[in-house]
Regions:
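Polyanionic/metal-chelating signatures
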Residues: 10-161, 169
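Catalytic core of soluble alpha/beta enzymes
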Residues: 143-144, 164-184
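Aromatic/His-enriched, Gly/Pro-containing loop or helix-boundary segments
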Residues: 1-7
Length: 184
């Protein structure tokens, strides 16, 4: 919000930004689209009605970060397993929320609401189509795996970032309405 680069970017014609967390984690966190305005809070800069996004990463980055620590996921297969585990948990969380919401007001008074979980709220937002997925993947096989996982859990990938091998699966990306955010 107080970065002097905002005014420099504006001079170059940049009127808005999509700010994402880093790409070391399988599920990195939420992103936000903002207008390039000099304001004191990020909320006052948010682009009207722009959905939040979720940054995810596969392949090299999580493999390197966690592998160097001797932790999982340290392989590409471990990446896929970690995603599937998280999406299964998110489906369960969403199911519990829906079951609770379907109850009458009287029944709700007798039962506790499901415990709030911010990570699961973000993932269920993806499953409900409210949060857009931006996935950091370099390799074509990794992107194809991520598309398979997205289909398995019925969510959409909006964009692959740094997809240097996206050209190898251009038809697959086009068929699934996925764009690439690549280096120039």
């Amino acid at each position: 919000v107080q970065d002097p680069q905002y005014s420099l970017a504006l001079k170059g014609g940049v009127t808005s930004f999509h700010i994402l967390p880093g790409s070391a984690n399988l599920i990195g966190g939420r992103g936000v689209t903002v207008k390039n305005l000099q304001r004191n809070t990020i909320n006052s800069m948010k682009f009207p009605k722009a959905p939040h996004s979720l940054k995810m990463a596969c392949g090299e980055n999580p493999k390197r970060v966690y592998g160097n620590r001797g932790q999982a996921p340290s392989t590409r297969m471990g990446n896929a397993a970690g995603y599937r585990k998280s999406w299964i948990q998110a489906e369960g969380y969403l199911r519990r929320l829906n079951e609770y919401e379907e109850k009458s007001d009287e029944a709700k008074e007798l039962e506790y609401a499901p415990t709030r979980d911010l990570e699961m709220e973000t993932l269920t937002g993806v499953l409900k189509g409210e949060i857009l997925v931006h996935n950091h993947c370099y390799r074509a096989d990794e992107m194809a795996t991520m598309i398979d996982i997205a289909k398995e859990f019925n969510y959409k990938i909006t964009a692959f970032h740094h997809g240097v091998e996206a050209y190898k699966i251009a038809d697959l990306l086009a068929d699934n309405g996925i764009c690439g955010a690549l280096w120039a």
